[in-house]
Regions:
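Short, aromatic- and glycine-rich surface loops/edge beta-strands on solvent-exposed regions
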Residues: 1
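Beta-strand/loop-rich accessory regions of lumenal/periplasmic or secreted enzymes
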Residues: 4-295
Length: 295
């Protein structure tokens, strides 16, 4: 066992002013530019749709807020409940999206909800995104969950990176996969690995390769850290691919690196043959506050 020598405190994360930024608006987007970056924020997406820094595209699809994980064997009894709630098909509805320049940073304010089509929202949120001239992004998010809905598989951001962004470094529980109720065989350290090596190759495809309680993550050229520890997963397979395929030999790589940065993920439990997931391991907070820096 490892012994913590001091109590872990919440970080204070700020992004510094780094030069002038400009802001443009069109019907669908806010566009932030500097000498180094061109970032596009989708007004109807509630997140960035393009990130270009030093002439290189950092993402290959819009960022999204994600609530689904490919069910593990122990999710077999709760999977239908999650699907009925619409966690497997989240849809973002943006109510307002405004932006301004203050000093040398751009600020975007977004009020949105998450629901599946034809269902009431299960999450209502307000997000503040800050961007500096070097391309660092700070997200400050406050979300309220409708407690009539079941606990959530996960809640966080998904980034779709170029396939060659496969080098991974993190400080957290490793080197094997870890979850909030499955990390006793792991230890906290700084690990370097690759996207291929993060894969836990289960015969029946499912959520795998997560790393819990991370204070720093780097995948390819992008780094991330939160004021509180986060979970992350980087894979060549989408959650949808892992959900739909019955055998590991049927899996098809997406052609991208799918990077999940999670505020939280429910534990994996033992409900395939044992009791339901214990309440302390469920992601079921009525109010969530998340601060995250990506850059």
């Amino acid at each position: 066992d490892q012994i913590a020598l001091f109590e872990e405190k919440e970080k204070v994360l700020e992004i510094a002013e780094a030069g002038a930024v400009a802001l443009e608006e069109n019907d669908t987007s806010w566009i932030i530019t500097s000498d180094r970056i061109r970032y596009v924020f989708g007004k109807k997406k509630g997140a960035f749709t393009e990130l270009v820094r030093d002439g290189k595209a950092l993402i290959e699809a819009p960022m999204t807020f994600e609530t689904w994980r490919a069910p593990v064997d122990n999710d077999r009894n709760v999977r239908q409940v999650w699907e009925e709630a619409g966690y497997d098909r989240p849809w973002i509805r943006v109510y307002s999206c405004t932006a301004e320049i203050t000093g040398e940073k751009a600020y975007l304010h977004c009020d949105f909800s998450i629901a599946s089509v034809y269902r009431q929202p299960f999450l209502r949120a307000k997000a503040l995104w800050e961007v500096n001239a070097d391309g660092q992004i700070k997200l400050t998010l406050d979300a309220d969950k409708d407690m009539t809905f079941p606990y959530m598989p996960r809640f966080g951001l998904q980034l779709v990176l170029p396939e060659n962004q496969d080098q991974v470094e993190y400080i957290g529980y490793g080197p094997t996969e870890s979850y909030q109720d499955k990390h006793r065989a792991c230890w906290v350290d700084r690990f370097t690995t690759t996207v291929d090596e993060l894969l836990e190759d289960y015969v029946k495809p499912q959520e795998n390769g997560n790393h819990y309680h991370c204070t720093f993550v780097k995948v390819g050229e992008l780094k991330a850290e939160g004021t509180k520890p986060i979970s992350f997963n980087a894979s060549y397979y989408t959650a949808q691919e892992l959900t739909e395929k019955m055998h590991n030999y049927e899996l098809e790589k997406s052609g991208h690196v799918i990077w999940h940065l999670d505020y939280g993920m429910s534990g994996v439990g033992s409900n395939s043959c044992g009791p339901e997931l214990l309440k302390q391991y469920r992601l079921n907070e009525e109010k969530m506050h998340w601060e995250l820096v990506i850059g």
